[in-house]
Amino acid sequence: MLKLFILKLFLFLFLFSSNCFAEWKKITDSENVEIFLNFKEIKKNNDLIFFWQLNNYVKPLREKIFSIKIYIKVDCKKNKFNPLIFSYHVEPMGSGEADIKNNEQTKWILVKSKSKHKLILKTACIASFRT
């Protein structure tokens, strides 16, 4: 229970301080979204990597959401991922008021070839081996 509290506290503090220190690099975009990664914050733990992704929307999503930060766990060898935390923001680039949600589903998602997820995860996995 204490570990869970400490983890949530750490993530809360990180989410609200991350914009000041984050170095978001644009990976891809489409009609309504730009997708960024924070390469400086990629963490490795055995065969898994953990990183933050930022989706910045040109037109707001539901409830005036202009950006979403997602903390993602990836198994680079097995080509699968699990989004752990979603942070919904009312301003662009992960700024402004945030609504933080833990992902209740713990199922891994297999990456489809030729998808944006494939590009994002491949980029993060390659970057993790350089650090």
Residue ranges, per PLM feature:
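N-terminal secretory-pathway/extracellular module detecting exported/lumenal segments
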Residues: 20-70, 75-131
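Bacterial N-terminal signal peptides
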Residues: 8-17
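Bacterial N-terminal signal peptides that target proteins for export
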Residues: 1-7
